[in-house]
Each structure stands twice: as C-alpha cells, then as structure tokens.
Amino acid sequence: MSAFLAPETLEDPKNQTVVAGFNVTLNCTAKGSPMPSITWIKNNDPLAIQSNPRIKYIKTALDDKQIHSQLVIEDAKKEDKGKYHCVANNTVGEKASNPAFLSIEDLGETYAVYFFLT
C-alpha cells in the first residue's frame, strides 16, 4: 500500500538573462504520490502554449513519484520577460516553486562602418 504525498518542489527555476533571438530553458522538478503534474505560470497567469508556437514543455518522469519539466522559449523576445514559476499539483494538494525572473537583452541592430583613408 503506497502513501499519498502532497507535491514538493525539488528544483526551482533560476533567474536568467538571455539575448533576444536566443533560446532559454527554465527547469522545475517535483515529487509527490501520486506523481504530480506541473504547470508553468508567467506573471501570475498560466502559460498557454497553444497560442505561442515558440514555447514548448518537455516533461520527463524520473521515477513513479518524481517529474522534471522544462519550459523552453525559442527565439526569445522582449515580451517573454517576466516572473515565471511552476506549480506541482496532484490529488493531495499543490505546491508552487519560488519564482524566477527572465530578462531579455536587446542588443539592437549591428552596423558596420567603414572608413576609407585616402
């Protein structure tokens, strides 16, 4: 007979700064019994990956109680900056991770200037 355990986060996402146009990955690991599901939250709203093809979830079961989730943002843009956290949820309860802040640096366009000396 297995015991039921409320979710607990084992790995929280970390603060990151990424240059616009590059990919960024946020990680979250949780455990519980039954195994929790993980959802991602941005600025206190659930992320809807269906409306943004640049955002992907990768979920991996580590064993019968632990799950690892990656939130991958491809081609990061200014609008991706914000506060992110994950929420682990099962039939016993839910647990939110500590937040991580994602900053996007926009280096702008690069111009080459040539000087010709005569």
Language-model features: where?
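Immunoglobulin-superfamily
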Residues: 1-118
